[in-house]
Amino acid sequence: VTSALPAPLIELASGHGVATEFWDWQGNHRQVEESTIRTVLGALGIPAQDDDQVAASLRARREDPWRRVLPTVTVIRSGRSHRLPVHLPVGTDFRARVRLEDSGVLDLEHSRGAVNREVDGAKISELEVLLPGSLPLGWHAVELVVGAGERKGNGDAPTHSMPLVVAPEKLELPEFLRGDGDQGWGVMTQLYAMRSRQSWGTGDLADLADLGAWAAGLGADFVLVNPLHAAEPHPPMEPSPYLPTTRRFANPIYIRVEDVPEVAYLSAAERQLVEWHADDAQRFLDLDFLERDAVWAGKQSALLMVFRQGRSVRRERAFHAFIEREGQGLVDYATWATIFAIHGPDWREWPEELRDPRSEAVEKLRQDRSEQVEFQCWLQWVLADQLAGVQRDLRETGMRLGVMHDLAVGVHPHGADTWSLGDALARDVTVGAPADQYNQLGQNWSQPPWRPDKLAELGYAPYRDMIRAALRDAGGLRIDHVIGLFRLWWIPEGTLPREGTYVRYDHEAMVGILMLEAHRAGAVVVGEDLGTVEPWVRDYLSEAGILGTSILWFEKDYDGDGGLLPPESYRELCLATVTTHDLPPTAGYLQGVHIDLRHSLGLLNRPLEEEKAADEADREQVLADLRRRGLLREGAGVAEQVEALHRFLSFSRAKLLGVSVSDLAQDTRVINQPGTDEEYPNWRVPLAGPEGRPVMLEELFTWRSARRLARTVSREA
């Protein structure tokens, strides 16, 4: 296809991973708008607003690698040798070595220069250093000692250094999943919505432990929980767990106050006040929608009292060890939360001297407000302690994985990460998705993307720290929109989602680092790979040992009659479920509640009756498939239909199966309606029973129907 774009602009964009064309979900070839390409290049720090800038940027693109002695970072797989380019003035003597993360040193072989080029008036030679495939896994450094001649000795100070990451060739499955036909199962929950009579109006980590213990008693291997990332530290709190302020730290609303050891130090009057806050929160349990702000106001007051009690010598040492381990990232987050309380939620509107986390003004404020900063650090320590306790308890109850955390695709555009990580996150663009069959106008998620160039310059440290935090005390990790490790749809600010373009990432580095950290954590990784995906990507992830995601409603036999994909045809390396949080609970889906809801919100693309007829025909085809397989009797009610769908899924080849707590409760209400904001109470709907009445965990655990559905997934029913 002939492009109308200037050839130099196409070359520049291609060199920086910016797509100038793509294929849409209907198989149509699309050319990206020229203005979009220039804006996205600008967001990557590449001047491209006119032909002169494009020409200059192209020259820089061609010459910059020759100006750099070593690449910014290199990520390789264990067992594969790699030739590392080195650029030095012609005739320069040097010695290359790898300094291993355990402080060991290995000398490296290198070739003499075979290619020379003149750059900035100097003749530069390109040489190659051989990285052997025998290097151990880990975070190492390649060091060059220039002018060393043939001298040996590891004491020479390196002249140049580069981070080197060695990742496993493949992320191996846990032993219990390695055999042919081996399968595990677990429950999936939105923790905030799943309450008990002991929680303070929203679900907490003690509730998570109780759910896990109950499920473990039925043979479950994991509990998949929504992203627990931190939201705003003061009202109003963003309800979506997929729009956090940071992905490295967690939301203290999930703390169970009574389980903090220092509660024992409270005076009788203080303990009575904590009990009053707990009792007051009970009034939120019977409401139709969750009241996060009110819940957090009471919980924060109680936690502040506990914080001010001080700690034992042992606990104080543990607290400071946590602060030291988390480093500058924790201090930055705590400082941001403190300034937030003073100057409001958008750091871009703070006094100018406070917009830079490394400014003297920020350091002074940190000292002046040291108690508030320490309180925020303490909240994260308590969270980490309780999360570790949940994972420990679940493994002790017999779960083979335990908690599976969920990693959101991005962060709030003016939250903690955008303040503290600087230009590692792109400005003036947001992440979204092009049009597809479910969202024909495209999507804008209002989240700033990682800048691939800055991640590389930082040695992927911010990405690594985020992954490590998500994997700490976890048996598994779900990656929302795992395709974002390969490419993301960047949308210039002020434009429509369809006016964006794809920007590529170094997927070898992104996936390799994920594999290394998951290997070290002993965790399974599940990638949510729904939507528009390049055909080779799923194969790449599978070869890396990363599981995909299969949703029953989306798995159709397109080579047959268009009905359900037979369970024996499911891919093996996946987490298979009947539903997902962007669909209604299965009982609601079977009753068409999503059609009625979308109609009431004006989201249908065709008349209501036409939409209902098509939806009913699709569901009837599914139910007919179940009846033909002998899994469903004629005239069966909704509860039996839900059970039959899960029984069908249990015959699949998928390594992991999941059942939603909403399905265990026979809930029908939609958790999240894509395409809406204030029009629907997204992420504020509590767990309810079939009549729409909120249901507590204590009640759910007594339901025979819940146990029967869980056993259906485990093939025991």
Each language-model region and where it sits:
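Long, contiguous interaction/targeting segments characteristic
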Residues: 1-65
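Residue-level detector of anion-binding/catalytic polar loops
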Residues: 19, 221, 400-402, 476, ...
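Short helix/loop capping segments that flank catalytic or ligand/cofactor-binding pockets
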Residues: 23, 174-175, 197, 412-413, ...
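Acidic/aromatic-lined carbohydrate-recognition and catalytic surfaces
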Residues: 43-103, 107-144, 153, 163-420
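Alpha-amylase-like alpha-glycosidases and glucanotransferases acting on alpha-linked glucans and related
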Residues: 91, 234-384, 410-658, 662-664, ...
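Short, exposed coil/turn segments at beta-strand boundaries within extracellular/luminal domains
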Residues: 149, 154-159
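Structured C-terminal cap/extension of enzyme domains
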Residues: 666-717
